[in-house]
């Protein structure tokens, strides 16, 4: 069986908001609504606690040309301003009285040509494609030995959670991958508190002021 993952990515942080697995025989234009609904559900789940924005608030939808269609552009929510790459056309476009589709297509085309639209498309190429490269190529998720879409999706979501955790660690400590942590200066310390012995890993992290901070993690403990 073949499946295709779709990511909803925050272009500011690069974090994956939603990752949905679809059957590979479904086109991008038919799966976009399901993926956006999943992103909305996840944002609503954390909105009250974390103050996360909801999908009903104004947002920009940036996508490649595979998601471009008249129906997709017409059916987008009012809060959405689309910037979806437009495939090439032969000849003139004919609307047959469908003014809503005409306005949606021309509005999307105009936003793509703006400086903001060009900047968002560059960010899409960097951050969205990076999430796929980390999960599918570097992460080895191009091929999985699992049966059923539900099992594949659960495995993939765990992988995406690890990708998001790397972004969080990089923001907090400056290192987000095992290779990055391996390059950090570190030391192992042995400490004894009463009858409790601790093995502590200390990692020195550079900050903007060139005065290193340190992070301590207890990696083992035992009672004497």
Predicted regions and their residues:
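Anion-binding and metal-coordination hotspots
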Residues: 1-224
């Amino acid at each position: 069986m073949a499946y295709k993952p779709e990511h909803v990515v925050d272009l500011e942080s690069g974090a994956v908001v939603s990752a949905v697995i679809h059957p590979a025989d479904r086109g991008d234009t038919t799966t976009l609504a399901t993926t956006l609904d999943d992103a909305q559900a996840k944002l609503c789940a954390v909105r009250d606690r974390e103050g996360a924005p909801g999908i009903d608030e104004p947002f920009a939808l940036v996508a490649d040309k595979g998601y471009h269609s008249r129906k997709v552009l017409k059916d987008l929510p009012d809060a959405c301003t689309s910037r979806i790459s437009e495939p090439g056309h032969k000849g003139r476009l004919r609307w047959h009285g469908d003014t809503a589709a005409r306005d949606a297509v021309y509005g999307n085309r105009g936003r793509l040509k703006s400086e903001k639209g060009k900047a968002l498309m560059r960010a899409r190429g960097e951050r969205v494609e990076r999430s796929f490269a980390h999960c599918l190529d570097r992460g080895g998720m191009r091929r999985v030995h699992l049966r059923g879409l539900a099992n594949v999706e659960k495995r993939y979501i765990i992988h995406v959670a690890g990708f998001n955790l790397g972004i969080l660690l990089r923001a907090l400590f400056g290192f987000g991958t095992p290779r990055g942590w391996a390059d950090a200066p570190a030391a192992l310390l042995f400490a004894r508190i009463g009858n409790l012995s601790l093995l502590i890993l200390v990692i020195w992290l550079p900050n903007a002021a060139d005065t290193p901070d340190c992070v301590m993690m207890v990696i083992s403990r035992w009672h004497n």
